[in-house]
Amino acid sequence: MAARRGRRDRVAPPPTGGPGPDPGGGVRGGSWASRSQAPYGTGGSVSAAEQVHEEGNDSSFVSLSRLGPSLREKDLEMEELILQDETLLETMQSYMDASLISLIEDFGESRLSLEDQNEMSLLTALTEILDNADSENLSPFDTIPDSELLVSPRESSSLHKLLNLSRTPPERDLITPIDPLGPSTGSSRVSGVEVPLADSPWDFSPPPFLETSSPKLPSWRPSRPRPRWGQSPPPQQRSDGEEEEEVAGFSGQMLAGKLDNSVNNVLDFPMHLACPEEEGTAEGADAPASAPGDESISSLSELVRAMHPYCLPNLTHLASLEGELEGQADADADELTLPEGCVVLEIVGQAATTGDDLEIPVVVRQIPSGSQSVLLDESLGSSPALQLLMPTMESETEAAVPEVAPCPDEELPLSSACLLEPREIMESLTPKEPQSLPASASQGSQKVPRKGRKKKNKEQPTACVEACTRRLRSSSRGQSTVSAEVNSQAGSSQKQPQEELQREAAALQSRGKPRAWARAWAAALEKTGSENLERSAGQDSPAEEDALDLCPKLLETSQANPTLSLNDSAQADSMPVDSVEGDSPAVGNAAPGDQASSGTELVGSLPVGPNLTSPVLADKKGIEPAVAIPTSDNLSPADVLANTVAADPVPNDPAPADPVLVKCRPTDPRRAAAAAAAAAQGSRPSLQSADHPKVVSPEGKDVVGPLKVEGSTSATTQEAKPRPLSLSEYRQRRQQRQTEAEDRNSQPPVVGKWPSLPETPTELADIPCLVPSAPARKTAPQRSPIAVPETVSVGSNPVSPTPEPSASKLMVSTHSEQVSSHEMPLAVRPPPPPLPSVSPAGPIPSTVPAPLPPFPPSVPPLLPLPSGGHGVPRLPPPPLQPPGLPVSMRQMPPDPYTQYAPVPPWSCYPSVSPPGYSCLPPPPTMPIVSGTPGTYAVPPTCNVPWVPPPAPVSPYSSSCAYGSLGWGPGLQQPPFWSTVSPPPLSSVPTGRAVPPTPVEPSGDPAGPPEDVLPGPVTPSLSSGPASPAAPPVEPTKPEAQPVPVSPQPKHKVSTLVQSPQIKAPPTLSTEGVVFEESVSERLKSETQENRPKEKPISTAIKSVPVPKQSAVAKLPAVHPARLRKLSFLPTPRAQGPEDVVQAFISEIGIEASDLSSLLEQFEKSEAKKECPLPASADSLAVGNSGIDIPQEKKPLDRLQAPELANVAGLTPPATPPHQLWKPLAAVSLLAKAKSPKSTAQEGTLKPEGITEAKPPATACLQEGAHSPSPVHVGSGDHDYCVRSRTPPKRMPALVISEVGSRWNVKRHQDITIKPVLSLGSAAPPLPCTATSQEPLDHRTSVEQADPSAPCFAPSTLLSPEASPCRSEMNARTPPEPSDKQQSMRCYRKACRSVSPSSRGWQGRRGRSSRSVSSGSSRTSEASSSSSVSSSSRSRSRSRSRSFSPPNKRWRRSSCSSSGRSRRCSSSSSSSSSSSSCSSRSRSPSVSPCRRSDRRRRYSSYRANDHYQRQRVLQKERAIEERRVVFIGKIPGRMTRSELKQRFSVFGEIEECTIHFRVQGDNYGFVTYRYAEEAFAAIESGHKLRQADEQPFDLCFGGRRQFCKRSYSDLDSNREDFDPAPVKSKFDSLDFDTLLKQAQKNLRR
């Protein structure tokens, strides 16, 4: 900024670039820098302002916009303000980064007296901006004070202010150079802004840029005759020239301390940048400086209108700071023109907010490489902003950037994010590339309207990419923003190669110049990004080139998703950006040249979709996506990943600066979007090839079903451009944006709107039938490019979103993820189904993504969200996984992937789309992500091969519960896989993994799709803490492995469950979340493998992905935590008896047929204090429970998949509900939870319940709880049968599985939301066996006190605890009840799940359970379980009302399972005396109690009322009998006793009252016993007054009452304030009337 101003003023600004008191440039420069920054961060004018806010300058810039008019009005005041310079600086410091402040200060230092004035103007403008920016520009990413957040966007007003204030005629401004504050014409007009613009250096002839720019300006902004510069167009041209010089000379000043007027070749973008449409079209023809300036002003207004006011204000402020930039726009642009490598992106619109209408081109002006380079070099040294802009390639990028800004909004938000948190933007180069790309697109589109610009963006991908690169470099610290920008730009231009980008950049440069404010923004970015740039300064040049290399790939990705970019620069691009950020870190390979080429292809398809989905999900879920943006191409994929990972945990870490993960705070949608953008760039190349159509479709337009869910997520991401923001800031801005977005959307200048954060879906997405899911699975391969990548993105993006939540975890995961990440992209690239399968097999982080890929086809969006991190990413755990996953996807191409290239699973999953599974290896990526590096490695083996991964089991186990997953041994076998499936889920993954399982059912080759799904889901559920139990669970085989599984899973699950539950941050974070995803995917694969005997696993995985996407689609509506719970729900699915048990255990806590049942479950669980396990512990332990569930549920899984779907009522069409209710249904029920259908259904229903009833922690717990419980619930009516049958044998180890299975009951599948993790840990060992007989009782007790028996208790306990309330509170412990308990709970959960219809289901289910139990002994056993579940559900509901339900459950447990089942089943059943009666009586007892209470109260009230009525009647009687005497004008000193004494002379007084009034006479009422006494008092009462008193005003009291009973001022009633109805006479003394009257009076 200082440099630019210096060039403008022909004074070398201080190398630091502090704002100098430029005649016109000081303020203007400062403003410009601010603006420059703001656009960078905001993706539009507002973006700039917001970015400034983020940096602290954002606010000042916004203020500048508002300050503009005041500056014009107060040109002299600006000087006065200079006096307040220090104060202003102090004020701004809170809002501005030290760099910007230093720029301002430095400006003053290096400037002449002119600079002092400029500084004054700048300070004034900045101060005003800071004061007003908040209200003016509400950017989700702005670090603007609450005031701005609270203030609604001043769209038009800000724009007009800015336009009016921002530009004085060029002549004025140009004249101003002589008189910095100078001639009042320009200086007074722009005050601070104009002053800086008007500098002696401004006399330089305008550079070609301004000329080019000014022609543009006319198109979108008619040239105004405003003499902003105080000089004629020539001065403006000089300004342009100066501006160019400033870019070059900026560096020169910074470096050489002199303006380089020769930098005329630099094409600067003046206001046309701010108003790209007008500027680009009209201004392009008018080169006159004055015209541009005038047009800038006029155009700025138009620009402001075009863009959202909040956006424009930033641009406006920038323009104002720019010294009425529009008038001087060209000159200013040159001044602001960043150094050679710098890319100045001027975003007129805020794509994030506006979405498609973001037409504000991000003007990345390429300064001549020659002079610019030198200046830039020095500038880099002096000015961070310059450093950022300096990258060697920046000149090329700059050339490209100048006019290509199709998604300036996105870009700006990205820039804003970058500027806001440079520390978070470790990869300055790569992020710069993305930003440069958008900048280039912005410039390209600048000439045309924003839409046209968007098209241009596509047309000019090279320039865009280059510009993005420039910009990314410029705003290294705004990498998130850069990524977003690049994403938006990449969508259209990333396809093109570097050379193309460069050529296009040159063309774009000739086409249009970056605006002055864009340059200022670039300068600001340079300053802010300088840190990052410095970090990557060594690699800046190479990194620049690498970035360009990456940029082309990114462009490829972007072009792969042109629809996204085109769809909505803000929305689609933002979303892609988010995705890219989330995935790009993983695709970090794209950052390095080598990585870019290899990783781009690999990550290309994979990252884009997944990342897009993941970022969106993360955004939607408020999870902070970590974006790893490789800084240099030289980094290897692994290096990039490592850097990304490191960057994610330590965004500011210089070492991983290249592929640094840019974390977006979960609550910062913009930042998430930015991260997504960064990831998207890396992943977009792949997407473009395979996923582009779908990714773009879902993200841009939700074309694909799975992508639809993703699209909504993407839309969210797109809407909210990720930008480093604190959680509080993000929340504030989100709220603001929600309110403001509405206003802005309604307002014409929607283009500049900030993307409004999409609200978490409150309603469950329609759950596709599990059967349809299978087709969807097949579709998944088709969608693989999009769905799978998105899924992967989700998987990886969860890592990205998770980075912040689990920085350390991410780091751990990152290591493994790095390899798996890359592999995952490959897997993702293949059809989503394979990828999900691969993902599960691969790194856990991939697991979530892998599930997501399957989901994209149908259920994926819904389920993947919870399981794949799409839904889960919102959850805190998913975010952990996303960081590693994206990185892994990108950076770890084939390590785990190749390692675990479990081609068999993918081979098994050929139907899923073996082509898509060309990346089979990627699935192993999941394992890597899943655990720490070791852990992830294990899951991959299990995940991909599902049978072959025995070896990885140990790593899995080592990682956490995941290691214990032992998928290698058990996964290979169908039962084992099912069992294994749950273990991965045990940790946080439980929720996530489960969703993948639901997907499985649709495509499950073995048995019902749901069957397949349960397996994978169960593993997912158990994957985490249950991982240790997983190996035992893995032996899903009913009896053979039950013992090993039983002891190990139980023990390990308990340990892991408790460990992850309570303290699974490392495991849970990395494994929990990442592993969850991995397990989810892997469990899917496992389950499917078990079902198809390893071959179907692939198919199952495929099917799982499809249902998952469906679930994902629904899940978005559900809260992230709830989504995770949903994920968990499907997880519990046992292939064999043990699997069934484990499925039950796994699902115990998470069962829920629908939201209502979920809520019920949750309520019961919470209400029930029997399960003391902490929600968090349960949440952590969810994975453990999940692990067990899959094994237990596997046998039942196949049958239950359809049945569960029907039972849950989520996919009734797909599966006949009664089919699975048969004895086989027991297994089916258990597996149902895992089945894709049930998972999807549960995901759908359960998200509802979870969303409503369970908090995120509760959701996790419920996931864990439901992991064990699914077996029971999953069985549905047969659940109790299966449960009873299975509990004794495998209950100890398989309880979790059983639980998972339990909740798989048709209704229960969604009902089972209780995480059985904790419960599983505490109660599983004991309840396992005992629960069979008394599952409810044990579950209740275990639930309350024994977190060590999660397997059994979870299933049973979860049933009651599965209720929304209980799920959270008791879900942790309840999942420990015996299988029966779990079954009962599942059953009950099913009812609860369905809540409204769930209760009806309860009866039906209970009856069904009874019939089933009587049907067969196994069914009987399961039936008792189911019936217990039903009872539990009943109690759960009761529990919702009171805490008695736990006791009821206990009683129920005491009762025979069968009896209990029947009782629960039919509340009218005689056997329900104990349990059903209890629960019922409890509920009734509460009623009776309340009733008695009410009666008592009512009685007392009636008595009181009666008394009141009696008094009223008495008074009325007395009044009517004329016994009440009204005494007025009572002296104030008189007391009631005195009054009574005085009037007692006339007779016996029954009552005497005195009423004192502040105003008016005091009065009283005296009631005599006899009327004659009253008459006497009235006649002679006046004689009683004393000499000093006024005569009493005597009359019969209540005379007003006679007229109007309700008016009691003078009534004797009034003295008592009796509420008795005045209007009712004694004759109308009936109780009702009196009561009504009394109430009425009381109201008065």
From Swiss-Prot:
Comp. bias intervals (Polar residues): 437-446, 475-496, 556-572, 811-821
Taxonomically, the superkingdom here is: Eukaryota
Q: Specify residue ranges for compositional bias: Pro residues.
A: 12-22, 828-864, 874-884
Using the UniProt annotation, give all residue ranges assigned to the region (Necessary for interaction with CREB1 and NRF1 and for transcriptional coactivation): 425-460
**Could you tell me the gene encoding this protein?**
Pprc1
Region (Disordered) spans which residues?
1-61, 170-249, 429-616, 646-761, 773-884, 978-1074, 1322-1507
For bias type Low complexity, the affected ranges are 213-222, 515-524, 1409-1433, 1453-1489
Outline what the protein does.
Acts as a coactivator during transcriptional activation of nuclear genes related to mitochondrial biogenesis and cell growth. Involved in the transcription coactivation of CREB and NRF1 target genes.
* Keywords, ordered alphabetically: Activator, Nucleus, Phosphoprotein, RNA-binding, Transcription, Transcription regulation
Q: In which tissues is it expressed?
A: Expressed in liver, heart, skeletal muscle, kidney and white and brown adipose tissues.
Subunit: Interacts with CREB1 and NRF1.
Region spans: Necessary for interaction with CREB1 and NRF1: 1361-1432
Signal peptide feature range:
none
**A single Gene Ontology molecular function, please?**
RNA binding
InterPro entries noted in UniProt: Nucleotide-bd_a/b_plait_sf, PGC-1, PRC_RRM, RBD_domain_sf, RRM_dom
* PANTHER family recorded: PEROXISOME PROLIFERATOR ACTIVATED RECEPTOR GAMMA COACTIVATOR 1 PGC-1 -RELATED (PTHR15528), PEROXISOME PROLIFERATOR-ACTIVATED RECEPTOR GAMMA COACTIVATOR-RELATED PROTEIN 1 (PTHR15528:SF5)
Domain RRM, by residue range, is 1523-1599
Pfam families to which the protein is assigned, alphabetical: RRM_1 (PF00076)
From which organism does this entry originate?
Answer: Mus musculus
Question: Where does this protein reside within or beyond the cell?
Answer: Nucleus
Keyword Nucleus set for record: yes
Task: State the organism's lineage.
Answer: Eukaryota, Metazoa, Chordata, Craniata, Vertebrata
Ranges of compositional bias, category Basic residues: 448-457
> What's the protein called, per UniProt?
Peroxisome proliferator-activated receptor gamma coactivator-related protein 1
